[in-house]
């Protein structure tokens, strides 16, 4: 089996040749897989771009006042790019959950790469206000590092980022505990990013966590932090705790509190007031529905709700205010960490897909597991979220394959077809996937900007996905850059 010569590794290298460099270290580079390729005529690409511009304006302007971009697989679908593209038409871009475990890679107009983790992907657009909502968890040192990296690369963050006073603080001790927890689990480890996300949400649920607003009361901050340290000591034998450690941490956060103060806001009030003022809000989800604490492949999930319900609880806005929700899905499937993956490809097939798609985690650099597009899981995500449309990303990565496959149903070992996505992991791990095989396409589609210019086989692939899940594909990604997007 062979894959595309024009892959994301080549596109990223071309972008890096432009002015400036990325402020965040890129994931480990993988060798390209190169094959002869038929290129689309340049003139056709130019005319297609003109048609695409009109369609793009129509698509984006038609989005509702409060819209959302959510992942519909196991993360890493390319949500950040779509948010970056849509952001100029919105007044506010808001993160509703998660923390620095999210990794959103975007490129500015000059091709400079930015790897964002907590700061919303709308930050590259000067007129956009970025909000980190109450459902997120904030590692303050990491937050400042991200801001410093942005500003050192010419991105103005002054007065453009607000953090909810209700958001919980993620401390270094949460990260230490995360590593200890994974070590305890040994062979059954979940495969977290070890960024402390789970332990921080655990502190929130057990009600001994500290919130951003606690930084405004340093007279009691130390006592509250002491409770948190003692709890970690009692639960993890390897966690060291001393009074001097506590004093050092309190002094450190006194300095952080002064710098963070201009960013702190009652974002619940701000967002609801903005809705009253008819301002447009774009919600940027982190992770994805298949990692949802309730609906994902538990326990191999994140600790928050990256599905539609998390928008309301993570921002404090009413369900009736939410309009269009766009589900972002790769043209194939990837997963980082442990957990069942029914359509996973092993050996040479999986390796080639990983190399062509540059499938290495933005946050951890870990190689992603790769497989065919899982229609059963995608339909499940569409049901839960009520997506109004889909953004199919990385379609170009499949170029060069003689055939492409869609996992259309699950059968139990006895041959009986499952009627829904199973919540029982024992069942999920034993399913036999039934595939639908479609013809592949050989031509390079990375310069295509009009749907009609795509090879017929690629169009058929897109349309078959629409038929199977019952949701239209409005956006198609054919490369990492802002302009590498087809509006259907």
UniProtKB/Swiss-Prot annotation:
<feature type="binding site">
    <location>
        <begin position="75"/>
        <end position="81"/>
    </location>
    <ligand>
        <name>GTP</name>
    </ligand>
</feature>
<feature type="binding site" description="in other chain">
    <location>
        <position position="193"/>
    </location>
    <ligand>
        <name>IMP</name>
    </ligand>
</feature>
<feature type="binding site">
    <location>
        <position position="76"/>
    </location>
    <ligand>
        <name>Mg(2+)</name>
    </ligand>
</feature>
<feature type="binding site" description="in other chain">
    <location>
        <position position="302"/>
    </location>
    <ligand>
        <name>IMP</name>
    </ligand>
</feature>
<keyword id="KW-0150">Chloroplast</keyword>
<feature type="binding site">
    <location>
        <position position="368"/>
    </location>
    <ligand>
        <name>GTP</name>
    </ligand>
</feature>
<dbReference type="GO" id="GO:0044208">
    <property type="term" value="P:'de novo' AMP biosynthetic process"/>
</dbReference>
<dbReference type="InterPro" id="IPR027417">
    <property type="entry name" value="P-loop_NTPase"/>
</dbReference>
<dbReference type="GO" id="GO:0046040">
    <property type="term" value="P:IMP metabolic process"/>
</dbReference>
<keyword id="KW-0809">Transit peptide</keyword>
<dbReference type="InterPro" id="IPR042109">
    <property type="entry name" value="Adenylosuccinate_synth_dom1"/>
</dbReference>
<dbReference type="InterPro" id="IPR018220">
    <property type="entry name" value="Adenylosuccin_syn_GTP-bd"/>
</dbReference>
<feature type="transit peptide" description="Chloroplast">
    <location>
        <begin position="1"/>
        <end position="47"/>
    </location>
</feature>
<feature type="binding site" description="in other chain">
    <location>
        <begin position="76"/>
        <end position="79"/>
    </location>
    <ligand>
        <name>IMP</name>
    </ligand>
</feature>
<feature type="binding site" description="in other chain">
    <location>
        <position position="366"/>
    </location>
    <ligand>
        <name>IMP</name>
    </ligand>
</feature>
<dbReference type="InterPro" id="IPR042111">
    <property type="entry name" value="Adenylosuccinate_synth_dom3"/>
</dbReference>
<dbReference type="GO" id="GO:0000287">
    <property type="term" value="F:magnesium ion binding"/>
</dbReference>
<feature type="binding site">
    <location>
        <begin position="103"/>
        <end position="105"/>
    </location>
    <ligand>
        <name>GTP</name>
    </ligand>
</feature>
<comment type="subunit">
    <text>Homodimer.</text>
</comment>
<feature type="binding site">
    <location>
        <position position="207"/>
    </location>
    <ligand>
        <name>IMP</name>
    </ligand>
</feature>
<keyword id="KW-0934">Plastid</keyword>
<feature type="active site" description="Proton acceptor">
    <location>
        <position position="76"/>
    </location>
</feature>
<dbReference type="InterPro" id="IPR001114">
    <property type="entry name" value="Adenylosuccinate_synthetase"/>
</dbReference>
<comment type="similarity">
    <text>Belongs to the adenylosuccinate synthetase family.</text>
</comment>
<feature type="binding site">
    <location>
        <begin position="394"/>
        <end position="396"/>
    </location>
    <ligand>
        <name>GTP</name>
    </ligand>
</feature>
<dbReference type="GO" id="GO:0005525">
    <property type="term" value="F:GTP binding"/>
</dbReference>
<feature type="binding site" description="in other chain">
    <location>
        <begin position="101"/>
        <end position="104"/>
    </location>
    <ligand>
        <name>IMP</name>
    </ligand>
</feature>
<keyword id="KW-0460">Magnesium</keyword>
<feature type="binding site">
    <location>
        <begin position="477"/>
        <end position="479"/>
    </location>
    <ligand>
        <name>GTP</name>
    </ligand>
</feature>
<keyword id="KW-0342">GTP-binding</keyword>
<feature type="active site" description="Proton donor">
    <location>
        <position position="104"/>
    </location>
</feature>
<feature type="binding site">
    <location>
        <begin position="362"/>
        <end position="368"/>
    </location>
    <ligand>
        <name>substrate</name>
    </ligand>
</feature>
<dbReference type="GO" id="GO:0005737">
    <property type="term" value="C:cytoplasm"/>
</dbReference>
<comment type="pathway">
    <text>Purine metabolism; AMP biosynthesis via de novo pathway; AMP from IMP: step 1/2.</text>
</comment>
<feature type="binding site" description="in other chain">
    <location>
        <position position="287"/>
    </location>
    <ligand>
        <name>IMP</name>
    </ligand>
</feature>
<dbReference type="Pfam" id="PF00709">
    <property type="entry name" value="Adenylsucc_synt"/>
</dbReference>
<dbReference type="InterPro" id="IPR033128">
    <property type="entry name" value="Adenylosuccin_syn_Lys_AS"/>
</dbReference>
<comment type="function">
    <text>Plays an important role in the de novo pathway and in the salvage pathway of purine nucleotide biosynthesis. Catalyzes the first committed step in the biosynthesis of AMP from IMP.</text>
</comment>
<feature type="binding site">
    <location>
        <position position="103"/>
    </location>
    <ligand>
        <name>Mg(2+)</name>
    </ligand>
</feature>
<keyword id="KW-0658">Purine biosynthesis</keyword>
<keyword id="KW-0547">Nucleotide-binding</keyword>
<dbReference type="GO" id="GO:0004019">
    <property type="term" value="F:adenylosuccinate synthase activity"/>
</dbReference>
